[in-house]
């Protein structure tokens, strides 16, 4: 046992003759301290030899500097300075040693040590001598010193035995490492035994045989200090010496106790490795013995898992129990308990058979024969297994080497299976497995047979080109063959010892011989079917026999496991011995470099490369002859086998010889391709192909998914088709090992139909070459067809089907025939074929009207399978049809998007080619039938929606003809082509925008205004843009006739001299004097008549007053005016500097450049809504839109066909589609999994903290009785839908603590296991902000609490089970849940109901109606967020009483009691709050942002110029289609989700000034262009730069004891995609901003007034709810105000005139707003736009304006 570690000490200091103590392995029943006598003698001989060579030299120091190279001391060496008897401690050669102490005869054996300088040194007394022990029988004592020749005699026995000689006592080695202390103690104890001190050594019970004397104690202490320096002592030894420095006996006692424990562990390991059981003893006794051993090892830190334990038990089974090796060896999850159940069953059966029927149980050979017959109940499958399975893993390599050393006896029949070939594990000492090491499969030696090998048989291999065998007993005429080069699947050389003949004697008494190679380095004996075919022998897997070509059966084939075998009983044995074979071509090399060493030295290069390099002198220093190349032949480097593992080679043409065994359509190849992403739901994502082995005929079928039933439907279809059409039955189907083929449903189907499934090797595509090559060819054709035709990607399967039709008709270069000819079908009639994507005109048999055009443009796809028609794609109808009513069109270009309708002509060649087909149809037509033009019933792509979210009316809006288009052209086009658009985009048309939906030139050049709206500029006092519409001089509410000017966008200058215009008086929006603007003459306008209708946009009559408050009604009382003024008072509005009156500017000088992008600025993203839009008129009447939007008939326009570009390899993302697809921001995972936090965590300190948190969580779960610990359930007995997966998640909290949480996978929870009607409520953020605001105004105390493991207090009603935590080690068991585990769907609702009931019933609280998780009583308000509670009260004792009641039921922690009168800091739900009662409150997130933002990997610029605003006006997101690689796109989307997710969290908490930018960028998460990412980076940079900003609240000091709730509203008209408006609202309580909202209007508004009304109507419900909450929490009167900068909206609210409503929708919206304002007593007031802080919610603002509107409430 000690040999491995003791051998490390190759030298000993102080002139010791014995370098180390080497011993033989200790027998298990031997004393662990006993050492073989033979080894002792050997060591003493070595000591004698070493001492004889020593020379004595003077020493300059008593202590050697290097203990490993100490020089011997002379006789004049110094003695200890603090002892009065130096000579007794240091004897010279001339002094007589005391009897029994001859060890000190050599002066160098006791050096002078620093220990003796210590005042604690314990010297012997004046009269004490060194211990003298009488010589006892059998005690090896000293002999005369070989150096001095003197004889040292014992003084007590000198007279009786003067001539007796004694041997020297061997000294212990010097301790040099704490790790060597256990082995050193053993040698030290042996030293004491040899010194006649064995009686003082403690026994197993810790007590010595006799008492130790003082002299012996002195000797023990001194020798221990000399040979065990303190710096090399283990910690536990130092701890003992620190208490009592002389307590060496205690050290020895503990050491012996440890050695005894180690001996027991070693005995248990050896016993477990050498188990034997044959039924001679009761099975209960055997089970008890094994389980006790396993339990002891597990308790001592040696973990034996189930798999290893089962392996060890099965290896020891013999007799009738041996068959369990074969039946159980493939059960991966087998447990020891299950294995013993089988053993008990056999034992009981064995006992019963002995009493009744002696032959009741079959022998093992019968079992094996039965198993073979059972496995052959299904059709066999052709296999092509790797002949070198040993190269697949390291374990298989070890197995191969074991086989090479075994001697296999020749097997003559199948009964050889019963012969045991296993060897027990030889673990002879404990060092084979250290303490704490887990016993795994690698520890167990492999047998000389593979786990899946059938002993006594040859493996049939169709992929092996040569036959290889391990045993030499069947090789005839063996000879060496150094020239043969055989490689395995990894292209590594297989060493071949010999070549010979393998002779068969088959059952028809015929003999056959084939060549065989001998090698011991393979896992199976391989029989090559190629070599059998060379001697006219083939394997028929339909009959399971080897047969000749004439049908003569030679031998049966046996299926075992996944392979097919032939018995070795048909082999003729030879007389060649194993050593003869193994020594063939083996030469002895002497004094040469071993090849494995050179192989590793030269980077694991192969032998051929190394030899070639040495021959050419590219490597110097040694030659080729210096290397022993004999081992290079059979050397297998395990590292190379693992690192360079490849797939096995496939022999070209190896399958051809078996094709003749099958008739057409009996052997099929199949494979599935897919999925194809980014397609409509109606288009298929997969296709499945079939290829006949003999005829190479191909079929393809579309699939939308890979479910079992979908695959089964296709198999049913094709089998029925082959049976009915070709009168053939499919026998074998070859496929890969995908789950769609290996599922039980398909397996049963094939078995029922008598079809053999032939599976290929996993991940071996070359073995499935026929199907794989077909899919690759079809995909190449598909891409080519789509590229050539320009058709959209969703028609990809039509291209596949077209290619399949053509490929079946093309001749094969090998067979010179086509697949159709092989199948007996006629050739393809090319007159019925059209080019893929050929433009055609299809007759519309059901037009909308009689004057509607009858032709619909379309594109030919492929011939129909169900009729004589053709499948044609109609873009305008978004579907495919099966029809014969079409006319072929052919142009100069073949690309779909390059066709020019005017240039289309009939192609003569195509017409001539198809003439015969059309004449055939014409001759057989009796009358025109509209029934032929039907939608294809078979086609999967009928009624395809090109994009599920694309508006259907967009496609009908095309660009109208330009002014330069001649009228005649327009007329001709309308005659030729239907008004309906003839095409549809591939995904979403990238050109769908205002530029091609609306006539951009005319519309953009004329800012049309039918009347003046005072709110167009939000109440500005001047108008900076000319109004180019003629206006009436009167003050009526009627709109005048509007004129539209021609395009002057490209003009360089525009002045009064160039146009004739008249001045029109216009009312200023700010109430200033009327100004005049030029009117464009009629000659330069396009006249359009607009019906007069009542206008709601005109401003109401108003006086020239500077008063900015417009009341709802017009009372003249002073009290009403004071109320309205009080609403404005105390609001954080900006202070505007007074403006001097200015002249109205020249409108044409300040006219902004007109750009089509400004017409809908936010179509591209953040638009310019402030620079010009807010001062321009934002109106456009509904009638104007209807007049301007015209539908183009030029549907073949090149520009509009651009969306049908050919497919590209990159992902194409359109802006509008991406914006519409965004529903919500995907939450980003911030937690760690178990493997991330513990298993692979390289941070040791963090890992330890997570482990501590893990155990803390487990203890808490057990404490809360989360599951039933009394009963464990078997997984098979429980309904799977009631089993919930679980996992541990870890995270680091903001306070630095590490948290572990055991959660359930509620995301995959079955709907039947929870009540979907239950709600998990938490406090609304507005409720929390309202409570905080009221607390500040009323001097409330704020207390923060936390309830540990809150969910676990709630019981669970449903019957649910989870898998136990990993540390329990019960993977196959389930436990029933009793508590609401975190992660379950119902846990949140259960906890809410539990805590709600307790607060109401036990704490006297009541929940505020409409505001969940807000509880109150007369003194306390509670806001609940899961397990966090915030308490508000006027009296702190009220909070304490609630806390005491909570602690009675729940584990409640007080995070912050809030009793101080100074500033208190809180961390409440992510908000960092600084609160001083009665003064102020500051809300921010500086610490959190400082920690989180750097982790986002955003390129921050801390030293650069800081951004002053989150965005600037005039920025547009480019609308060009984005093209990205798939992986790059996913990565950028994921990055956007992280960045916008953090920004949203911050914005909705307190940074309401950023909500507009966050909302706009959130709509572009799925459009991660560089521009969008840059804008997002700028937003994050701005948040980083302003992370120290806080939302500032000050205590309000109202004149009256009332609460004032105000909402400020604003809207930006038409600045979002699809002309949606952006609306924003800010809510203030007593002058403090408590919330904000910025969102895109759900409906499209037709004017600014509509947008403003929509914004106000969106704010009123929340305003009323907040009002109710405030009244419940604070019993004060409340005043509600609504502020807007739209005077038109105010006029509608106060007016009773319903004639202003232009339509029913607008009228109902306005009337509802009137009712809400009057019914809820809202005070509607006007506010100037410059003071409207809600403006930051609706548009990007200049830096100065942004700061002006926000610096009073956030800074």
Swiss-Prot record:
Location of motif Bipartite nuclear localization signal in this chain is 1178-1212
Q: Could you name the domain of life of the organism this protein comes from?
A: Eukaryota
Which spans does this entry mark as compositional bias, Low complexity?
1-16, 153-165, 402-418, 960-969
Q: Which residues take part in binding Mg(2+) 2?
A: 1346, 1427-1428
Q: Where is this region: Integrase-type zinc finger-like?
A: 583-640
Quote the CDD domains the UniProt record gives.
RNase_HI_RT_Ty1 (cd09272)
* Changes after translation: Initially, virus-like particles (VLPs) are composed of the structural unprocessed proteins Gag and Gag-Pol, and also contain the host initiator methionine tRNA (tRNA(i)-Met) which serves as a primer for minus-strand DNA synthesis, and a dimer of genomic Ty RNA. Processing of the polyproteins occurs within the particle and proceeds by an ordered pathway, called maturation. First, the protease (PR) is released by autocatalytic cleavage of the Gag-Pol polyprotein yielding capsid protein p45 and a Pol-p154 precursor protein.
The record's PANTHER family line, in alphabetical order, gives: TRANSPOSASE, PUTATIVE-RELATED, TRANSPOSON TY4-P GAG-POL POLYPROTEIN
Please state what the protein is called. Transposon Ty1-GR1 Gag-Pol polyprotein
Species this protein is from: Saccharomyces cerevisiae (strain ATCC 204508 / S288c) (Baker's yeast)
């Amino acid at each position: 046992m000690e040999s491995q570690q003791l051998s490390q000490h190759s030298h000993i200091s102080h002139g010791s003759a014995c370098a180390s103590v080497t011993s033989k392995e200790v027998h298990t029943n031997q004393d662990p301290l006993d050492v073989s006598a033979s080894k002792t003698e050997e060591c003493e001989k070595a000591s004698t030899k070493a001492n004889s060579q020593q020379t004595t030299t003077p020493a300059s120091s008593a202590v050697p500097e290097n203990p490993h190279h100490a020089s011997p001391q002379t006789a004049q060496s110094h003695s200890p300075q603090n002892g009065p008897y130096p000579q007794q401690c240091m004897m010279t050669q001339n002094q007589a040693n005391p009897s029994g102490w001859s060890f000190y005869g050599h002066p160098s054996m006791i050096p002078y040590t620093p220990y003796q300088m210590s005042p604690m040194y314990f010297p012997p007394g004046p009269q004490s001598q060194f211990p003298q022990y009488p010589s006892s029988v059998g005690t090896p004592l000293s002999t005369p010193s070989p150096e001095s020749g003197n004889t040292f005699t014992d003084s007590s026995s000198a007279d009786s035995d003067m001539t007796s000689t004694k041997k020297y006592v061997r000294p212990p080695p010097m301790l040099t490492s704490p790790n060597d202390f256990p082995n050193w103690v053993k040698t030290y104890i042996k030293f004491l035994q040899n010194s006649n001190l064995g009686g003082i050594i403690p026994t197993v019970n810790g007590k010595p045989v006799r008492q130790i004397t003082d002299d012996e104690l002195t000797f023990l202490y001194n020798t221990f200090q000399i040979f065990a320096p303190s710096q090399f002592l283990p910690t536990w030894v130092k701890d003992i010496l620190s208490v009592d420095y002389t307590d060496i006996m205690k050290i020895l006692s503990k050491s012996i106790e440890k050695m005894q424990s180690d001996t027991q562990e070693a005995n248990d390991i050896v016993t477990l490795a050498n188990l034997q059981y044959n039924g001679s003893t009761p099975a209960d006794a055997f089970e008890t013995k094994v389980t006790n051993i396993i339990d002891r090892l597990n308790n001592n830190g040696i973990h034996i898992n189930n798999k290893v334990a089962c392996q060890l038990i099965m290896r020891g089974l013999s007799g009738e129990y041996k068959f369990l090796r074969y039946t159980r060896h493939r059960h991966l999850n087998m447990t020891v308990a299950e294995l013993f159940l089988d053993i008990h069953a056999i034992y009981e059966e064995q006992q019963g058979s002995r009493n009744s029927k002696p032959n009741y149980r079959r022998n093992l050979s019968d079992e094996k024969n039965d198993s073979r017959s059972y496995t052959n109940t299904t059709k066999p499958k052709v296999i092509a297994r790797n002949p070198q399975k040993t190269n697949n893993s390291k374990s298989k390599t070890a197995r191969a080497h074991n086989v090479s050393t075994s001697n296999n006896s020749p097997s003559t029949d199948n009964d050889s299976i019963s012969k045991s070939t296993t060897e027990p594990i030889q673990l002879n000492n404990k060092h084979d497995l250290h303490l704490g090491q887990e016993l795994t499969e690698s520890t167990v030696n492999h047998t000389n047979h593979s786990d899946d090998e059938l002993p006594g048989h040859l493996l049939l291999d169709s992929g092996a080109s040569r036959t290889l065998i391990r045993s030499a007993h069947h090789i005839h005429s063996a000879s060496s063959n150094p020239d043969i080069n055989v490689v395995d699947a990894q292209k590594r050389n297989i060493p071949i010892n010999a070549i010979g003949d393998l002779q068969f004697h088959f059952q028809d008494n015929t003999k056959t011989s084939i060549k065989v190679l001998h090698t011991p380095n393979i896992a199976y004996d391989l029989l090559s079917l190629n070599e059998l075919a060379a001697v006219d022998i083939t394997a028929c897997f339909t009959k399971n026999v080897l047969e000749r070509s004439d049908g003569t059966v030679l031998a049966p084939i046996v299926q075992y496991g996944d392979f097919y075998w032939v018995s070795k009983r048909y082999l003729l044995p030879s007389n060649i011995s194993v050593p003869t074979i193994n020594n063939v071509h083996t030469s002895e090399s002497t004094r040469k470099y071993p090849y494995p060493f050179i192989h590793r030295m030269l980077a694991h290069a192969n032998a051929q490369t190394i030899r070639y390099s040495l021959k050419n002198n590219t490597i110097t220093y040694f030659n080729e002859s210096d290397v022993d190349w004999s081992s290079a032949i059979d050397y297998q480097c395990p590292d190379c086998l693992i690192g360079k593992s490849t797939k096995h080679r496939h022999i070209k043409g190896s399958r051809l010889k078996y094709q003749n065994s099958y008739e057409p359509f009996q052997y099929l190849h199949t494979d599935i391709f897919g999925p194809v992403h980014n397609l409509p739901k109606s288009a298929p994502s997969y296709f499945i192909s079939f290829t006949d082995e003999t005829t190479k005929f191909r079929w393809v079928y579309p699939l939308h998914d890979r479910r079992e039933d979908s695959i089964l439907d296709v198999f049913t279809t094709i089998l029925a088709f082959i049976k009915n059409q070709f009168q053939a039955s499919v026998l074998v189907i070859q496929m890969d090992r995908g789950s769609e083929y290996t599922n039980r449903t398909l397996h049963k189907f094939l078995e029922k139909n008598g079809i053999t499934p032939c599976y290929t090797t996993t991940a071996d595509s070359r073995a499935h070459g026929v199907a794989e090559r077909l899919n690759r060819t079809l995909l190449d054709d598909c891409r080519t067809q789509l590229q050539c035709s320009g058709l959209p990607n969703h028609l990809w399967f039509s291209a596949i089907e077209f290619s399949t039709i053509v490929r079946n008709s093309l001749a094969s270069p090998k067979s010179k025939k086509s697949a159709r000819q092989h199948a007996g079908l006629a050739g393809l009639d090319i007159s019925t074929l059209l080019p893929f994507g050929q433009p055609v005109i299809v007759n519309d048999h059901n037009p909308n009207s009689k004057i509607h055009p009858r032709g619909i443009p379309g594109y030919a796809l492929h011939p129909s399978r169900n009729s004589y028609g053709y499948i044609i794609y109609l873009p305008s109808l978004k579907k495919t049809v099966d029809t014969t009513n079409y006319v072929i069109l052919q142009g100069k270009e073949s690309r779909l998007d390059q066709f020019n309708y005017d240039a289309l002509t009939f192609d003569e060649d195509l017409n001539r080619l198809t003439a015969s087909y059309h004449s055939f149809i014409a001759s057989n037509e009796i009358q025109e039938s509209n029934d032929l033009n039907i939608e294809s019933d078979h086609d999967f792509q009928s009624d395809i929606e090109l994009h599920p979210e694309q508006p259907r009316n967009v496609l009908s809006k095309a660009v109208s003809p330009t002014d330069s288009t001649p009228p005649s052209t327009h007329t001709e086009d309308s005659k030729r082509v239907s008004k309906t658009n003839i095409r549809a985009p591939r995904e979403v048309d990238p050109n769908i925008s205002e530029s091609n939906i609306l006539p951009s030139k005319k519309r953009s050049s004329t800012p049309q205004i039918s009347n003046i709206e005072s709110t167009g500029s939000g109440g500005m006092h001047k108008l900076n843009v000319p109004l180019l519409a003629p206006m009436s001089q009167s003050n009526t509410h009627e709109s005048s006739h509007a004129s539209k000017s021609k395009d002057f966008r490209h003009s360089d200058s525009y002045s009064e001299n160039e146009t004739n215009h008249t001045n029109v008086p216009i009312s200023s929006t700010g109430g200033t004097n009327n100004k005049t603007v030029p009117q464009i003459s009629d000659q330069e306008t396009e006249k359009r008549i607009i019906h007069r209708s009542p206008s709601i946009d005109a401003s109401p009559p108003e006086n020239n007053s500077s008063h900015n408050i417009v009341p709802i009604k017009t009372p003249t009382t002073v009290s009403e005016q004071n109320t309205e003024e009080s609403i404005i008072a105390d609001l954080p509005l900006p202070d505007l500097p007074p403006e001097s009156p200015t002249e109205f500017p020249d409108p044409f000088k300040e006219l902004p450049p007109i750009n089509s992008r400004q017409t809908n600025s936010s179509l591209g993203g953040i638009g310019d809504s402030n620079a010009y839009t807010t001062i321009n008129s934002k109106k456009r009447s509904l009638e104007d839109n209807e007049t301007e939007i015209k539908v183009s008939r030029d549907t073949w326009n090149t520009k509009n066909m651009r969306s049908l570009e050919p497919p590209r390899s990159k992902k194409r993302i359109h802006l509008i589609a991406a914006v519409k697809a965004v529903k919500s921001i995907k939450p980003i995972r911030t937690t760690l999994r178990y493997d991330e936090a513990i298993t692979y965590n390289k941070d040791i300190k963090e890992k330890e903290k997570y482990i501590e948190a893990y155990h803390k969580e487990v203890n808490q779960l057990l404490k809360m009785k989360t599951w039933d610990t009394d009963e464990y359930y078997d997984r098979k007995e429980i309904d799977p839908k009631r089993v919930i997966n679980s996992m541990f998640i870890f995270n680091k909290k903001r306070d630095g603590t590490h948290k572990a949480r055991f959660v359930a996978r509620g995301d995959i929870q079955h709907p039947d296991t929870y009540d979907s009607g239950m709600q998990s409520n938490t406090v609304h953020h507005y409720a929390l902000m309202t409570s905080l605001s009221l607390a500040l105004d009323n001097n409330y105390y704020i207390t923060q609490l936390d309830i540990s493991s809150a969910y676990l207090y709630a019981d669970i009603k449903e019957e649910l089970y989870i898998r136990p935590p990993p540390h329990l080690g019960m993977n196959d068991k389930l436990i029933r849940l009793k508590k609401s585990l975190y992660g379950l769907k119902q846990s949140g609702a259960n906890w809410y109901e539990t805590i709600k009931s307790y607060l109401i019933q036990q704490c006297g609280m009541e929940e505020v109606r409409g505001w969940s998780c807000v509880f109150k009583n007369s003194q306390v308000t509670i806001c609940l967020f899961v397990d966090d509670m915030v308490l508000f009260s006027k009296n702190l004792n009220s909070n304490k009483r609630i806390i005491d009641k909570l602690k009675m039921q729940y584990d409640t922690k007080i995070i912050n009691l809030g009793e101080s009168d100074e500033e208190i800091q809180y961390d409440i739900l992510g908000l960092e709050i600084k609160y001083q009662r009665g003064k102020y409150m500051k809300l921010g997130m500086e610490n959190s942002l400082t920690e989180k933002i750097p982790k986002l990997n955003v390129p921050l610029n801390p030293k650069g110029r800081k951004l002053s605003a989150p965005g600037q006006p005039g920025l547009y997101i480019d609308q060009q289609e984005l093209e990205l690689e798939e992986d790059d796109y996913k990565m950028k989307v994921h990055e956007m989700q992280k960045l916008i997710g953090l920004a949203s969290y911050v914005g909705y908490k307190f940074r309401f000034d950023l909500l507009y930018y966050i909302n706009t960028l959130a709509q572009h998460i799925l459009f991660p262009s560089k521009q969008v990412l840059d804008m997002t980076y700028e937003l994050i940079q701005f948040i980083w730069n302003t992370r120290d900003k806080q939302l500032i609240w000050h205590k309000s000091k109202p004149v009256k004891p009332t609460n004032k709730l105000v909402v400020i509203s604003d809207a930006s008209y038409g600045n979002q995609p699809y002309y949606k408006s952006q609306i924003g609202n800010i809510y203030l309580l007593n002058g403090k901003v408590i919330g904000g909202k910025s969102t895109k209007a759900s409906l499209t508004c037709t004017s600014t007034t509509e947008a403003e009304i929509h914004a106000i109507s969106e704010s009123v419900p929340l305003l009323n709810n907040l009002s109710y909450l405030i009244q419940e929490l604070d019993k004060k009167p409340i005043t509600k105000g609504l502020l807007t900068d739209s005077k038109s909206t105010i006029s509608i609210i106060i007016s009773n005139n319903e004639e202003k409503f232009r339509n029913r929708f607008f009228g109902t919206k306005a009337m509802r707003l009137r009712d809400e304002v009057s019914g809820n007593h809202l005070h509607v007031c006007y506010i100037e736009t410059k003071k409207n802080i809600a403006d930051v919610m609706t548009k990007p603002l200049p830096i100065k304006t942004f700061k002006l509107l926000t610096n009073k409430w956030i800074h």
